[in-house]
């Protein structure tokens, strides 16, 4: 015992039901001074015998041995810092409801809201041991913070994950620290084939508003199978589109930062999953479409099919990815766009090897990312599943890379591949939900061929929430 005290804070994620705990760890939580954040299962292991139970209740004011998993009540929102955060209807997992026995010792940080099938407030079941339509979702007492579920699944931009992210960030001492309200915008998928008339209005508007911005530039435009070029393969560079290149350099002089967005944003002649064309396909991860959400036989991609992340591409290796990224970086420099410092992975998907390869060329990425089973014990699980995550603030990840957040999503007028449409007003609402995160950013992206009016709605609304647009650094 005593090991926990060597650290600023300790986090325990209870994913395996009834997993045994080392006695030394139990004693550290019950009697130590370290801050502890516990989420999910096995909190009852701290009160397994009478002595431990009495010690826990006396110190923390609630009883884990009589706190039960509520899987009967429908919880579709979580209240935190005066906002209702969403909880996906697909998430049918139960939530452990802390049984509070001494209210004076327990601070309720967030409440689970019980709803009926129509979405209206409903009295919670008796298993929650509460009165009314709420029970504690997160509690804090004497250095121990407990969250009744692992809020890392079924997440989206307005999810209760934001409360989790803020609580995690709060483990670090920040007494008296004012909330940080930074915003960022990225113009997406600008390739040598982009139309100047699509891009210029966005750039002119952002400059006029004195809004710093990023441009995600794809160094090489490739139509490997001639899908849009009469069956003839086509590769194009920025110096073959001189008016566009001139506009990009103008943007750089007026608050624009170039971000390398892959090298070709596609992979050879492979339909990955669509057509082998830049900006459409994945570059560093294999994908295909299926008719069902949970996989099945690959089918031709259509508007209503599901995109599946299938594993590493055939060329996958650390060196392959490093060389490919470096090729694109050199190309941007060759055409006069300077030495880029930020990288964005196409479609936010890469293998473990590819992420490590990217690190050889860039120390900072600006995106969301994937994680894989076995990472903590250094066992590369290859294509045995993946886990996507976004952040509401800047982090340094397990790959050793600094990651700048994109956490609001993008404007999208229509549903595509079962992703819902998202308006400029939706982006503003997402930014509003992110206000619960003390150090939260409001970062989104926007494609050049979409209406300027929607960009204006997003920028204006995010400013009115109190955010300040800054360069992504």
Residue ranges, per PLM feature:
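Aromatic-Pro/Gly-enriched surface loop or interdomain linker
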Residues: 1-8, 179, 206, 215
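A glycine-rich, often tryptophan-bearing local segment used as a flexible ligand/cofactor-contacting loop or short
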Residues: 12, 16-89
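Acidic (Asp/Glu)-rich catalytic clusters
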Residues: 32, 175, 202-210, 237-263, ...
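Metal-dependent polysaccharide deacetylase catalytic core of the NodB/CE4 family, i.e.
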Residues: 44-46, 50-52, 212, 216-353, ...
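Catalytic beta-strand/loop cores that center a nucleophilic Ser/Cys/Thr
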Residues: 70-141
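Non-catalytic propeptide/linker segments at domain boundaries
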Residues: 116, 122-182
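C-terminal domain-boundary segment and adjacent tail
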Residues: 163-179, 197, 201, 208-219, ...
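Catalytic grooves of carbohydrate-active enzymes
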Residues: 183-191, 196, 319-322, 326-342, ...
């Amino acid at each position: 015992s005593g090991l926990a005290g060597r650290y600023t804070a300790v986090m325990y994620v209870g994913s395996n039901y009834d997993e045994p705990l080392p006695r030394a760890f139990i004693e550290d939580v019950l009697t130590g001074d370290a801050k502890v954040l516990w989420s999910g299962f096995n909190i009852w292991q701290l009160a397994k015998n009478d002595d431990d139970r009495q010690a826990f209740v006396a110190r923390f004011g609630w009883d884990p041995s009589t706190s039960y998993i509520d899987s009967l009540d429908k919880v579709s929102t979580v209240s935190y810092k005066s906002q209702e955060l969403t909880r996906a209807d697909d998430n049918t997992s139960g939530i452990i409801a802390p049984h509070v026995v001494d209210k004076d010792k327990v601070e309720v940080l967030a409440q689970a809201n019980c709803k009926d099938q129509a979405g209206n407030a409903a009295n919670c079941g008796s298993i929650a041991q509460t009165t009314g339509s709420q029970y504690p979702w997160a509690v804090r007492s004497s250095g121990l913070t407990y969250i009744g579920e692992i809020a890392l699944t079924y997440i989206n931009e307005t999810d209760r994950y934001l409360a989790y992210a803020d609580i995690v960030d709060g483990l670090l001492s920040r007494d008296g620290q004012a909330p940080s309200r930074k915003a960022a915008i990225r113009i997406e998928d600008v390739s040598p084939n982009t139309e100047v008339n699509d891009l210029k209005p966005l750039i002119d508007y952002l400059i006029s508003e004195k809004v710093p911005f990023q441009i995600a530039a794809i160094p090489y435009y490739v139509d490997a199978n001639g899908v849009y070029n009469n069956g003839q393969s086509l590769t194009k560079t920025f110096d073959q589109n001189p008016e566009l290149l001139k506009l990009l350099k103008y943007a750089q002089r007026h608050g624009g930062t170039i971000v390398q967005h892959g090298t070709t944003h596609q992979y050879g002649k492979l339909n990955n999953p669509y057509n082998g064309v830049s900006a459409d396909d994945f570059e560093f991860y294999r994908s295909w479409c299926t008719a069902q959400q949970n996989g099945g036989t690959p089918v031709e991609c259509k508007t209503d099919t599901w995109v599946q992340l299938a594993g590493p591409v055939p060329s996958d290796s650390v060196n392959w990815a490093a060389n490919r990224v470096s090729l694109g970086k050199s190309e941007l420099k060759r055409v006069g766009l300077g030495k880029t410092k930020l990288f964005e992975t196409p479609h936010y998907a890469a293998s473990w090897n590819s992420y490590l390869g990217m690190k050889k060329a860039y120390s900072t990425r600006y995106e969301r990312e994937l994680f894989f089973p076995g990472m903590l014990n250094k066992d590369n699980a290859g294509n045995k599943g993946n886990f996507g995550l976004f952040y509401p603030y800047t982090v340094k990840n397990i790959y050793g890379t600094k990651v700048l957040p994109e956490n609001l999503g993008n404007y999208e007028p229509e549903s595509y591949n079962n992703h819902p449409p998202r308006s400029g007003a939706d982006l503003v609402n997402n930014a509003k939900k992110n206000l619960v995160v003390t150090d939260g950013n409001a970062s989104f992206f926007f494609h050049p061929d979409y209406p300027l009016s929607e960009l204006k709605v997003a920028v204006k609304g995010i400013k009115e929430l109190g955010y300040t647009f800054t360069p992504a650094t």
